[in-house]
């Protein structure tokens, strides 16, 4: 069931969850950051991000998780790519992007080069980078996307390029943050958070450049799988859900 809950109503919603002995809930905007204040425990990744999208209720003890990051990193791993010791160029500094960065840092990325526009997220991105640098072995830098020379240099030495922004999603389906396809090299893994459209302009560019790609369905699938297991304690019906989603089609 879905409930529309604003910030003012959120504390009451949490009390209702406990009173009804609900096993848990998903959390969407605008409550992802606020929700951190109403759980008893946060995962290491959720602490780094400062936002959660999943709450699990164990007899009134609430744990907060962020499955966006685990979902995306799981999609990368399922493709056969080992992220340990690798460098990721990460586009954007919103919720999805920072969740991916946090989980990647925890699971062994050597370096994350954040690129985002100097907008309302920029200062938050700097703070996020500082938290990751202080709490993991991963080195995170944050650079204005307007610095195209720095962007080009980062891509030249990167192993992974991940788009954590809405660029590529309808109505921006004809746009990409990569202005020059020559910046993409065959050794680069290019991954998306956007799943509508299935094949974004960035993924089209990447395939033309000979890169391996992972579309946004991977993150959608695996973050949902993580939530399912957290709430039920059971294995996710992977093949059935893949069929329903048209995954891999």
From Swiss-Prot:
* UniProt-recorded Gene Ontology molecular function terms: quinate 3-dehydrogenase (NAD+) activity; quinate 3-dehydrogenase (NADP+) activity; shikimate 3-dehydrogenase (NAD+) activity; shikimate 3-dehydrogenase (NADP+) activity
- Tell me the disulfide pairings in this chain: none
Q: Which InterPro entries match?
A: Aminoacid_DH-like_N_sf, NAD(P)-bd_dom_sf, Quinate/Shikimate_DH, SDH_C, Shikimate_DH-bd_N, Shikimate_DH_fam
List all membrane-crossing ranges.
none
The entry marks the following residues as binding substrate, namely 32, 68
Q: EC top class, in one word?
A: oxidoreductase
Q: Could you list this entry's UniProt keywords, alphabetically sorted.
A: Amino-acid biosynthesis, Aromatic amino acid biosynthesis, NAD, NADP, Oxidoreductase
Quaternary organization: Homodimer.
Question: What PANTHER family does the record tag this protein with?
Answer: BIFUNCTIONAL 3-DEHYDROQUINATE DEHYDRATASE_SHIKIMATE DEHYDROGENASE, CHLOROPLASTIC, SHIKIMATE DEHYDROGENASE
The UniProt function text for this chain reads: The actual biological function of YdiB remains unclear, nor is it known whether 3-dehydroshikimate or quinate represents the natural substrate. Catalyzes the reversible NAD-dependent reduction of both 3-dehydroshikimate (DHSA) and 3-dehydroquinate to yield shikimate (SA) and quinate, respectively. It can use both NAD or NADP for catalysis, however it has higher catalytic efficiency with NAD.
Report the sequence similarity comment from the record: Belongs to the shikimate dehydrogenase family.
| Protein name as it appears in the record | Quinate/shikimate dehydrogenase
Species assigned in the record: Shigella flexneri serotype 5b (strain 8401)
């Amino acid at each position: 069931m879905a409930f529309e809950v604003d910030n003012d109503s959120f504390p009451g919603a949490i009390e209702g969850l406990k009173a009804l002995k609900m096993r848990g809930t998903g959390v969407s905007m605008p409550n992802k950051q606020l929700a951190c204040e109403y759980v008893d425990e946060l995962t290491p990744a959720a602490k780094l991000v400062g936002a959660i999208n999943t709450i699990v209720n164990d007899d009134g003890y609430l744990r907060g998780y962020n499955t966006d990051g685990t979902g995306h990193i799981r999609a990368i791993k399922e493709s056969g790519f080992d992220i340990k010791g690798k460098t990721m160029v990460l586009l954007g500094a919103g919720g999805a992007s920072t969740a991916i960065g946090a989980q990647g840092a925890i699971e062994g990325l050597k370096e994350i080069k954040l690129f985002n526009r100097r907008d309302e997220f920029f200062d938050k991105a700097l703070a996020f980078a500082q938290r990751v640098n202080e709490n993991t072995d991963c080195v995170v830098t944050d650079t204005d996307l307007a610095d195209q020379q720095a962007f080009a240099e980062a891509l030249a030495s990167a192993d992974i390029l991940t788009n954590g922004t809405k660029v590529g999603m309808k109505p921006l389906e004809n746009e990409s943050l990569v202005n020059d396809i020559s910046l993409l090299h065959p050794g680069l893994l290019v991954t998306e958070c956007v799943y509508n459209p299935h094949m974004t302009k960035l993924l089209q560019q990447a395939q033309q450049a000979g890169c391996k790609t992972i579309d946004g369905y991977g993150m959608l699938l695996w973050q949902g799988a993580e939530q399912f297991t957290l709430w039920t304690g059971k294995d996710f019906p992977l093949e059935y859900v893949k069929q329903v989603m048209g995954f891999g089609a």
